[in-house]
Amino acid sequence: MIGYSLNQLYKVVGITKQGVWDHFQREQTELEMIRGIMTRVDKRRKQHPGEGLEKLYWQLQPEQIGRDKFCDIFMQLGYGVVRRKNPVRTTIPAHKVFENLIEGRLVTGPNQVWQSDITYISVSGRFYYLTFILDVYTRRIKGYAVSDNLRAEANITALKMALRGVPPQQLRGCVHHSDRGSQYIDGGYLKLLRTHQIAISMGGRAQDNAYAERINGVIKNEYLIPWSLSSYRELKYYCKKAVKDYNTKRHHGTLGRCSPAEYEATWRKLPKDQRRVEVIRSENTPYSKNKLKSNVIDTSCQYPYCSLRIN
């Protein structure tokens, strides 16, 4: 058997010993970099267990790696998120319905349009129900409730929470939008809305309530389901934690990569001509700039709604 030295082998294949060493060092440096990012990803995932890779990248913003490479590497490492569909119907249709007041509406600030919806979650083989009320403009969850039934009491609890801390004068002209579920035409629920001079709006399709539908998926798929809850008591505790983390720590591209709480605080300090304007349009309704004022410019639409800014 003929023996060869490493230097002879390097010469045959056209590389140098220094080149091999440099390559090894680069690989070690990259490996250490990825391990460091993994530590940050794991820490973030403990609070936001279902957060997608692209959102994780923008949240962490690692300097040494681009978005696409980050997503590719961490997908291979098993950090991808499986999205679940929602096959269970929670809407019990009501005979009395209200007109859709928000289609095509311009929203220019907090407490102008709230959306609400009910969703379900299975815990230890039993269904429980979650009600959320969302401020469309800031994406902030204003109120929520956890229940073991579909009666209107949970909706009233969520609404009372949403109303707390908002001065009455800021609610005049606010529109509360929901689907046509019977919980939303309950006498006690309607009385609360009317007492605070909040207009009532309803949509006939899921697309008409898509902001609230999206929040259902975010709270369930990014928080509650990955936490593998085992009891009703745990569900209530972790739903509270999920809402808090969502409102204060989950960043949104539409909000300039701020959390809802950060965005609302920043928005109040902005001059009026620098505040974002949003047009509410359902998924199947074509968007037309001609219907808007000339000083409102369309920007890219990541979701079925257009985020706009006045120049």
Protein language model features and the residues they cover:
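Basic, flexible linker segments flanking DNA-binding modules
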Residues: 15-110, 206, 259-273
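A short acidic/small-residue loop/turn micro-motif
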Residues: 135, 146-153
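RNase H-like two-metal-ion nuclease catalytic core shared by retroviral integrases
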Residues: 91-93, 178-180, 186-191, 201-220, ...
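Double-stranded DNA-binding cores of transcription factors and transposases
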Residues: 1-9, 13
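Mobile genetic element proteins and their domesticated derivatives, centered on retroelements
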Residues: 9-10, 20, 41, 56, ...
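C-terminal domain-tail junction helix/linker
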Residues: 194-198, 218-311
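Mobile-element integrase/transposase regions
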Residues: 66-132, 156-161, 165-166, 170-173, ...
